[in-house]
Amino acid sequence: MNAIDGTSRQLKDTEDQTLDDTPSLLSIIIDAHVPSWEEIKSQISISEAVASILVFINAHLALHNSNSVNVIGYNASGARILYPPKSGVESTRSKEREERSESVSDGEQAPSKKDHSMYRQFKTVDEVVQTELWNMLNHTNYVEEEKQHNSAISGALSLALGFINKHVFVDESRMRARILLLTVGHKNETIQYIPTMNCIFAAQKLKIPVDVCKLGPGSDQVFLQQACDSTHGIYMDISEKNSKTPKGLVQYLLSGFISDPSLRPHIVLPTQSNVDFRAACFLTKQVVDIGYVCSVCLCIMSQIPSNRRCPTCDTTYSEKTLAGLGRKPLKKKKKKVVKP
Amino acid sequence: MSHTFQATNKKVLGVLSISAETKKLEWTPVSGDRAPINVNLANVTNLQATPENSAKIMLKIVAGDDPSTFAFSNRGTMIECRDVLQGLVSRARREASNPPPSATGDGSSTPATATPPPKKEEKKVAMDDKSLLADFQLQQTLLKESKELGKVFAATVIHGGLKPEEFWSIRVHLLRAFALTSNQKKGPYNVLSTIKPTTGSDNTVNVQLTPEKVKDMFDQYPVVQTAYDDNVPRLKESDFWARFFQSRLFKKLRGERITHKDPTDPLMDRYLDDEYDKEAALAAGMPDKVHRFVDIGGNDSQAGSESFGNRPDMTMRAGSSGRDVVSVIKSINRLSERLAQKSEAPLAEKEYGTLALADLQGETGAEYVPLQVRQSDTNGNKKDSDGDVDMTPLDAEACKEYVHSQYDNPVSLASLVHDDYSADYAQAWGNVQGAVNQQKGSWETVQESLMDPKVLNDLLVVHTTTIEFLRHFWHNFQEGSAECSSMANSLAKCIKRIDAAVGEVKDEQQHKLAVGAMASVKTSIHHALKEYDIALRG
Amino acid sequence: MTSQFKNSINDYLEGLPEAVLTRLYQSPATCLAVFRLLPALARTLIMGMIFNPDPIAVADVDALVKPSSQRLKLETQKKLRLLHIFTETQAHIIINPTFKKNLRAALVGGDQNISFGVPCDTEDKHKVDVAFLDAHAVSQWEMILHFMVGTSIGRTPSDGVLNLLKHSGLMEPERGGLRITNAGFQFLLQDVNAQIWTLLLQYLNMSEYLQMDPVDVLNFIFMLGSLELGQDYSLSALSETQKHMLEDLRDYGIVYQRKASSRRFYPTRLATTLTSETAALRTASQSMEAATQDTISSSVAADSGFIILETNFRLYAYTESPLQIAVLNLFVNLKTRFANMVTGQINRDSVRFALSNGITAEQIITYLSVHAHPRMKGMEHVLPPTVVDQIKLWQLEMDRIRATDGYLFSEFKNFDEYKDVSTYAKELGVLLYENPGKRKFVSTLAGSQQIVEFVKRRNQKHRSSAN
């Protein structure tokens, strides 16, 4: 009589060959740091990249009629949600745009209302994203040099996670979420390690895959690779540094990054990450075989710090403990030379 | 508590009253002619009663010189009186010979605070390192208990040449934990709850009784002791127990409610009275009835007050029905406390306080130790081949120019379809597919390189022993002890062992896997020996 | 779209010849709609191929899918092949160029195609709003449903609709009128989206008969699915066939035209949710209620169920709609009716009545869970498992006896003969029942012939050996 059992006590078949058709929410985080784009302008122009991103967004929306998208931009001053816009913002921005478009004669933009060849849903999203993104780019605050090297990836990730949390978990809609990070990266870029790692751990816990598409020569490849690795995301470096080229971005996006979270268990991911999991000293940044570990914050050191304090958590070590670490074995009268 | 009987002495009707507290017997005539007779029960040497078949119903009490005789109207009364007297006399005599313990003995422990009884001197297992290391028996038992540990011990000490003291010196904590757990004994428990009268085949009731149980019972319930002492010289033991287990006294001590259906037993029911339960008497020092007019607190309580609708809970009812229940609960609580005190690790006052129920106090948050972590920005970055970070100045103007130019000449989506890009797209696809193939390839190699379980086992044993030796080596290295050289020798032997184990693997592919698996351990041994050499020379 | 209807549309499309499909793929809207019907792996693969100029190697696809999900890959490839989106050669897979071009156009735009409908650029003098459209859709649709159930609300659907109902087997002609069939009962229990698709598929089937180009019909249907609610569209974008269809669709309440000669039309909610999730759709009566009450916002009313089912089999339905009450009456023994509620009980008789009319237990259970009150939906089990199990058991009761036609073989001369023949029957696999004690057995009709021959051969053998 188990056949008619109304209660669903059986575990789901893990080898379920039929895919669940849940819609998914894609959070795209776009690097809007103009100097970085300027550096790679010979390889790909911003507008080309923007167009590619829009096509990708349309493709994502095409996959399922309830798919939704969230676009966030970040630069040295911070991060901002570009789509969905705050209500009220939309009308003012589009008005601005129309004014601009009237003054500049660009045949492509003006009849946007009259171009009916694109699916309406795509069109509305595209327009808002374009407006907001260009806004962000145009109104970049070019502040002092030192501060230009900060990058607000952690802020952008937090915004994305917050948005996902609200729309998927709090509102309890049946959606899967994922994050795509499109970064260009300045070579002197500095990323706040701990806040970003916290965001990665949060994404890991919520089972949100974080994909990374790297277009430029930014540093911190290792740390972004780690992010993809721990969340089972895809890492692709298509910058010239990696002997590839960001040209053809749209094809990269449509073939590498299009896969839905519900499809991912069934396919091999085209990820390029080879994370080096070896331990590294916090002081010298070299890889460490045998070293010392702080008993409070667990940071690894290859030598005893000269100021007797831990570099990360600032605890002082007592003389006695440090002296004990430096002891050597007693020399015997007869030296036994051991041949390994 | 006193018993009164109608009795006639020398043909004068009177009232015979026996007081348990004062251990006195007093006979007062109804009509005041004769003098009352007072007998101290401790002095009673002989007690006689007329036999069953005799017509007379008389009781003769010999206390000292003069015997007194009392006549009763019916046999039953006489029997009762005789029983009471017997009990009291034997008790009085006993008390006379053994002076009673000081009044502050049992009775003073009130339920609120527990005074810990003197620590029982017991053979305590020493918990310090030295004795643990010397206790071979303990070590043997632990090895037998834990198979894992036994295996490691066999591999390192028996086969590998490690000294047992070395082995245990880093595992003292395991020994200590094991010693503590194996020394735990079961504490005292309410023995009456274990005695369950079972009904036999032909309606006989059987009870299992062992001398230990009897001893426990006397320990926990002094009333039983009293009853036993009073009656057993006279009654047979089996009879006594038989009657005891059927009596209401037994039920009361177990904490069950006494219903009117239970059989009464004149002998046993005497002990039901509160005079035998000193503690209860002391605890119930409050007067029975507090006038409602005065008892403001009692009137106010929500639970007790009937104006709130439902009848109050069984434990909250005023009057005699409430008292029975409450007394039962209280006596059980007292018993539990007594047992806890008797146990071997009595609680200090502070610890006793922690036993109290605290679920109404609200949650205490977790206490975290705050770490002051310095926010250094590029922490965790491994240096690749780049040297220092160089800061090229930022050209804000160029950037603005670039953005504006881009904004004015946007790329439409449709233009992406242009043939110019085809080559790029093809290449992009190729790269993506390459990544997929690479991933798939590495995946497949993982599948193929599974080691044969037997080989794996052997290598694991060798590996564990090596790690053990490495641990000891580093321990000694840091301590600067003299053992270091022998440890260095042992490490050399380890390498030989590893090579031997790997050499034993016949199959080509497995051999390769084995070599790969042991490579990192060998590196660590080499590293250790190098450090040792440097230390020796430098 | 519920998976049932995905499947039926898929089946229909797979049945079309390649040339037709290629013509179908010339409309980006259709490409998009068909794209969304495909399984997930197919969609991912296609996306990777739209901009790629070269065909992809079969080995690439094999490498992409994990070995444990082989079955998925095979199913996907099969489906894509049947729909002529992929053509496979020895080592390569080529995507249908028309499909590729037009799907890309849907994503990228700019080629001035009109498959997504052309909104009107002139103002409508008699503009209507969304609430009106909803009300209109509901009233049209419910008219049809009421007609099927038999409640009289005064209006009858147009002849075209009646024709459709007859041809689809939902109603049958009887004594001058139409009577609902078993299939019709099942139809009533489905949700609106499924109902519309049933009718549309039927329309599609009839269209070939009526010499309407199925490509046009499908294009129009898919275009409707991509239109925006509340926007009026011009007829200039439609072909003749499609204009003709408009009249029929008007009768179903899928589109609204002020009069037959209007140059514009409005899609209703029934149209715009043709290709979307059922969750986004309100049932027809709920829309009507919401429109009349005029208070609840659309998202809230979207999932307002109205049925409460207790574990003692009692049912309380907070509805006043005669349609819903009529539907409930099919399988619930309704006892009392109040101003805003009807109550009743599900018992064996009521469920048997439904079962005898061809409704399955699954349909009843689905209907109940879809229309369950939000309070019920919040619980771990939406419907009490006891009731669900019992409905299924009542259905099983109908199958207590299963009749199979067969031949009875009896009166064997001796036990040996019986044993031989029955063993032979068993080996053939045609033995249905045997009783060795009485030396009888029953075999299937088909197998009886062979057994008779076997017996004849055996008797001959015995006779010859005896002689």
Curated annotation (Swiss-Prot), chain A:
Pfam families: Tfb4 (PF03850). It is found in: Nucleus. GO terms for molecular function: zinc ion binding. One of its GO terms (biological process) is nucleotide-excision repair. The keyword Hydrolase does not apply. Belongs to the TFB4 family. This is General transcription and DNA repair factor IIH subunit TFB4. It comes from Yarrowia lipolytica (strain CLIB 122 / E 150) (Yeast).
UniProtKB/Swiss-Prot annotation, chain C:
GO terms for biological process: nucleotide-excision repair; transcription initiation at RNA polymerase II promoter. It is found in: Nucleus. Pfam families: Tfb2, Tfb2_C. One of its GO terms (cellular component) is transcription factor TFIIH core complex. Component of the general transcription and DNA repair factor IIH (TFIIH) core complex, which is involved in general and transcription-coupled nucleotide excision repair (NER) of damaged DNA and, when complexed to TFIIK, in RNA transcription by RNA polymerase II. In NER, TFIIH acts by opening DNA around the lesion to allow the excision of the damaged oligonucleotide and its replacement by a new DNA fragment. In transcription, TFIIH has an essential role in transcription initiation. Component of the 7-subunit TFIIH core complex composed of XPB/SSL2, XPD/RAD3, SSL1, TFB1, TFB2, TFB4 and TFB5, which is active in NER. The core complex associates with the 3-subunit CTD-kinase module TFIIK composed of CCL1, KIN28 and TFB3 to form the 10-subunit holoenzyme (holo-TFIIH) active in transcription. PANTHER family: GENERAL TRANSCRIPTION FACTOR IIH SUBUNIT 4, TFIIH, POLYPEPTIDE 4. This is General transcription and DNA repair factor IIH subunit TFB2. It comes from Yarrowia lipolytica (strain CLIB 122 / E 150).
